[in-house]
């Protein structure tokens, strides 16, 4: 699951209500809706779900994004523990920083040259599982 809303970075006291709602709906609520829908399909085919973590929780200005992303990953961890014996497998990976649109929104003007290739990072994550 890689769908995410990257709300504008802002101090917690300045988080816009619309951005907060959108962050909760996309980053957390959608995950809670998708899991019951896809679990039977994944279990029937011995499938797996992949979640992508982001280590920005607790950093200044990342409040809306980090709070909802952390909640999403917590839900995924619970699901992984619940299905460890029965399936589906639930994987959580922390990709290396990559030159994505989300990262560009958070770090405009960043030198993107040293960032990991999305193709290489995808291969790395998929090879682990």
Show which residues each predicted segment covers:
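Catalytic loop of short-chain dehydrogenase/reductase
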Residues: 4-11, 17, 43-85, 94-97, ...
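A hydrophobic alpha-helix adjacent to the NAD(P)-binding/active-site core of NAD(P)-dependent oxidoreductases
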Residues: 15, 23-24
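A short, exposed helix-loop element centered on a Lys and neighboring polar residues
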Residues: 35-36, 77
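C-terminal helical subdomain
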Residues: 85, 92-93, 100, 108-129
